[in-house]
Amino acid sequence: GGNNTYGIYGKTVNIGTNGKIKVGDNSVGIYSNGQYSSSATPTVSLASGSTIEVGKDQSVGVFTTGKNQNISSQADMKIGDNSYGYVVKGTGTKLTINTSNPVTVGNDTVFAYSTDTTGNIENRATLTSTGSKNYGIYSAGTVTNLGDINFGSGVGNVGMYSVSGGRVINGNTTIKPTITVSASDKTNKLFGIGMAAGYTDD
């Protein structure tokens, strides 16, 4: 697709192996607004070998609203500058990311963004940056990160950021991911942070 477009707009979405969605700037690869009684089974399923590629300027790879969505993604995600991989704005959402290939981002991106205070995110993807001002995971819910985050480039990169009383956990009893972040530019308030909670204007 071109700019200002939607690749798929629906409720239950399944992308099989070798499936590919590519959209341009200010666009959405997959938008789902499903309402479900439970998040027990995947409502958006992206198989291993599938690819989602989005352009720059507020594009989103997978955008979900609704209730009790269950997003299971093994897709390769390619994100343009000033854009998002996953955006969750529903309630009771479960997002599981388990892609085998590393995800590389440039500048001003957010790999996973969630305003769902009742949601859960588990990330196993390895994230790598080549630029500045990127967020790995920004969430109001519960996050478990099980993938390395290599954000050592540029300035002002943040591994995980928790808001609205959310909770972020790096690793478990068997997996111990490494978060590497960039330098800070204090003059311009661009801080390299591994994990942080809350919000400040200072």
Q: What are these language model-derived features?
A:
Residues I8-G10, Y36-A40, K89-T91, S114, ...:
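Short aromatic-glycine motifs in intrinsically disordered, low-complexity regions
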Residues G34-Q35, T64-N68, G90-T91, G165, ...:
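Beta-strand repeat architectures
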Residues G1-N4, T12-N26, T41-Q58, N68-N82, ...:
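Beta-strand-rich solenoid/repeat architectures in extracellular/passenger domains
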Residues Y161-R167, T180-S182, A197:
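Long amphipathic alpha-helical scaffold regions
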